[in-house]
Each structure stands twice: as structure tokens, then as C-alpha cells.
């Protein structure tokens, strides 16, 4: 599996997990209803499935590396979906996390 495919799987996993959590949030906190919650739960389940498609056999390594993608992806999601404006520390932290992803997954 190529690095590009692995990164694509990480991005897909992030969309499913962050999107799923956002749907649950919208359903409960924003009172949009249980349909939103149900769609969120389905999305979160699909996230778990996508995570299993990574090439490395070590669950801990995959989830640790994915954590960096999740941090950066969550900030990006907030910008696009909620109008959040990250400050320089948000951006710096996300970039540090992405460097960590590279070291954990692809430095070998």
C-alpha cells in the first residue's frame, strides 16, 4: 500500500469520525433530532471499519497516527462547518501533530 493510499484512508476515517461526532452533536445539542444522531452513529461505525484498512498491523500505531489527522481535521472541519477561526497556536499544534503522523507511520 502506498503512502498516498494510507493518507487517503486517514482522511476518509477523519471525515467519517469527525462528521459522525458532528452529526450526533447537531442531533442532541442543536435539537435537530434523532435521525441526525442515527446517521452520526452509522458514520462512526464506518470510521472504525476504514481504520482496519491501514497497512500496519498494530492497532496502537494506527490510532496514534490517526490522532494527528483527527486534530488537524477537527480544526479544518470547524473552519468549514462552524465558521471557527483558528489562531496561530491552533495551526502550529495541528502542524506538529501532522509531523508526528509522518514520523509514526512513514519514517521507516
UniProtKB/Swiss-Prot annotation:
Membrane recorded as keyword: yes
Localization terms from the record: Cell membrane
Membrane topology: Multi-pass membrane protein
UniProtKB keywords: Cell membrane, Membrane, Transmembrane, Transmembrane helix
Gene Ontology annotations for the cellular component aspect, listed alphabetically: plasma membrane
Membrane spanning stretches: 8-28, 33-53, 62-82, 87-107
Pfam families: UPF0060
NCBIfam families named in the record: PRK02237.1
Family as reported in the entry's similarity comment: Belongs to the UPF0060 family.
Name of the protein: UPF0060 membrane protein RER_49640
Organism: Rhodococcus erythropolis (strain PR4 / NBRC 100887)
